[in-house]
Amino acid sequence: MGVSGSKGQKLFVSVLQRLLSERGLHVKESSAIEFYQFLIKVSPWFPEEGGLNLQDWKRVGREMKRYAAEHGTDSIPKQAYPIWLQLREILTEQSDLVLLSAEAKSVTEEELEEGLTGLLSTSSQEKTYGTRGTAYAEIDTEVDKLSEHIYDEPYEEKEKADKNEEKDHVRKIKKVVQRKENSEGKRKEKDSKAFLATDWNDDDLSPEDWDDLEEQAAHYHDDDELILPVKRKVVKKKPQALRRKPLPPVGFAGAMAEAREKGDLTFTFPVVFMGESDEDDTPVWEPLPLKTLKELQSAVRTMGPSAPYTLQVVDMVASQWLTPSDWHQTARATLSPGDYVLWRTEYEEKSKEMVQKAAGKRKGKVSLDMLLGTGQFLSPSSQIKLSKDVLKDVTTNAVLAWRAIPPPGVKKTVLAGLKQGNEESYETFISRLEEAVYRMMPRGEGSDILIKQLAWENANSLCQDLIRPIRKTGTIQDYIRACLDASPAVVQGMAYAAAMRGQKYSTFVKQTYGGGKGGQGAEGPVCFSCGKTGHIRKDCKDEKGSKRAPPGLCPRCKKGYHWKSECKSKFDKDGNPLPPLETNAENSKNLVKGQSPSPAQKGDGVKGSGLNPEAPPFTIHDLPRGTPGSAGLDLSSQKDLILSLEDGVSLVPTLVKGTLPEGTTGLIIGRSSNYKKGLEVLPGVIDSDFQGEIKVMVKAAKNAVIIHKGERIAQLLLLPYLKLPNPVIKEERGSEGFGSTSHVHWVQEISDSRPMLHIYLNGRRFLGLLDTGADKTCIAGRDWPANWPIHQTESSLQGLGMACGVARSSQPLRWQHEDKSGIIHPFVIPTLPFTLWGRDIMKDIKVRLMTDSPDDSQDL
């Protein structure tokens, strides 16, 4: 506005009260000052650069909206938005101040406001104006003041200025005074007529008039602050009726105008209270802006009734006082017929519940007719008289009913029909399930129990098999972690295998994951000869299936077509002597019992794979099974590998060659335990006529991992399922799962940061540094729990420095990291900045110092 400081504040407050009082609205001075201070905080440019025009005022509104989004709506004064909206309507209707700015573009805003304020404040205090006396003197004085600021030339040049320009300024100010005097009312009617009787359109003033103006200007002094005169407060006086421009009798606005003239208040909203309490408040009707209705209808049509933006518009509408009839009219005008019926039903239910809850309270009674707008409150005119508390309840029920409208295209079905898709991730299914449950009932213990039950019952068959071991003891978070292995790649591979076998997806999953004992699925037992279901091998009538396929080239001697178990050669095709054939493991069908040897028990060869390390390459018949009921044959790595995230997909050799059994196809899938440890196996298909080496595609899923030579990393499924007399590693599987695959280790790369590791001590989690130079584990004093007993030791710890006053745990502590655990007696050092994990723990965790060359690796 061109004026800052206390003078600018008083000017703004005066103008604000004056403009609003002309519309019949009263604003306290304290509220106006609070709004001005908030305006400076939101738009600091406004006092110096802004003006009361529609463009700048809309910019202020946008900045108020951003301020509310950043600091919350509670940080905005309660009168800020109503004042801004009223001024926007005034500026839209081309208020007097806007017209003044448009007419006097050559005069700066600061000069015109100061001149206008001084003129109005002085003229309002005068009792009589005279036809050519006081008014002309005041105008001439203001012209002289403005001329002193407008012209920067010396006094002599001012005398030579064009008189026509001065006359233009006089004519502009006269027009402003004329409009201001017209708004003073009956109190100055007589003086206004005399003042307006002057011929303002006369371009040339007579010499007598100019003499009168100069004489009055000599006695004119305005030493007071620039405060526009405002109407005095009238205690308990009903505000004047709102002065509105006549609406054109066309369209929706014309229909509303005609209805108001005839006394029809069907669409009378919102209700505006003019005071601060229910006793003094006199409800006044104001129409809801048509732009708001159009915005709400557009949001419902384009984004749906339950979209976040639509709900924001509904909240904006709910910020006003709307009666039940208003809400019904708004919902009927913006919602589709079906959604309106849903909204009305929910609104009635919410209202009945609220009346029942309020029945036992001693406060003002709230009847169902008040909330629904029925009975004696059926007419809109009677609903206007409802108290604020009742209107708040009406708005609350209306908004809750609106939020209960489902999104477009979503049918309200029972929760039992909300099932997980075959290719849908489990966490996405849980998200949909929680959204549906929370729409029906509030969050609480009951909803959590229902979600957990449906999370098991409505999951797909693969996730149900993964959740089954922890169904009763686990939580929803445990279910999600268990189903992380059910990645889309695994599901896609399983679906492809089921399609090749000609089975349903659910049936194939049950057979693959042990849905029936001995390979018996939902369709009955599976024949190990022909691969079909419904009968066993001894009852198989397929003659082709009863005959054993002819053997290929012997993998032992490479010079005959016979089975390896029947090979009697002592030399291979190159004349090299062959080791004696292990008849107890090859010729007999007895299983190899016991666990696979640990890395410490075996040096070279294939560790823990069940394969003979002295006779590579291997065939399909040499691959072992984990247990007799295992569906897949184990594929093992034949070299040491270190995988990082940067390596991408790598090929792991298995040294398995040869064709698959006739009529079968191989599917390579990963093991669930490996994925938990950070190793991801990509599925692959092996054709029946493939004769090369089978390799496994792997990559690091989370961080760097180590694969030792001989570790089982994948499984080979023969489709259709064929039970071959392969060796078995373990007689019974028992309850083992997700951790039976060994030797895929935790790895941390050495970087600029310290190698830190989380370890549990007596169930408490500690973060410490891997210190290969520490013989014993040392716990920092700040990490040690106060209730754990310790005792002082007479010895001191010495390394690069020396630590005195060392304590030690009075009781042994059990440590645990992943599937490894042990007992330690750690030291407690008060001055230690962080915990140090010593070699007493690292050797049991199997921490290894490795490089890209496995020969340079060293175990701790």
UniProtKB/Swiss-Prot annotation:
A zinc finger (CCHC-type) spans 525-542, 552-569. One of its GO terms (molecular function) is aspartic-type endopeptidase activity. InterPro entries: Aspartic_peptidase_AS (IPR001969), B_retro_matrix (IPR003322), B_retro_matrix_sf (IPR038124), dUTPase-like (IPR029054), dUTPase-like_sf (IPR036157), dUTPase_trimeric (IPR033704), Gag_p24_C (IPR045345), Peptidase_A2_cat (IPR001995). Residues 151-169, 178-191 have a biased composition (Basic and acidic residues). The record marks 99-100, 195-196, 228-229, 254-255, 269-270, 496-497, 745-746 as: Cleavage. Residues 151-191, 572-631 are annotated as: Disordered. Its EC number is 3.6.1.23, 3.4.23.-. It holds the Pfam family zf-CCHC_5. Optimum pH is 4-6 for protease. The active site is at 771 (protease). Keywords: Aspartyl protease, Capsid protein, DNA-binding, Hydrolase, Lipoprotein, Magnesium, Metal-binding, Myristate, Protease, Viral matrix protein, Viral nucleoprotein, Virion, Zinc, Zinc-finger. Nucleocapsid protein p14: Binds strongly to viral nucleic acids and promote their aggregation. Also destabilizes the nucleic acids duplexes via highly structured zinc-binding motifs. This is Gag-Pro polyprotein. It comes from Mouse mammary tumor virus (strain BR6) (MMTV). The lineage of its organism: Viruses, Riboviria, Pararnavirae, Artverviricota, Revtraviricetes. The gene is gag-pro.
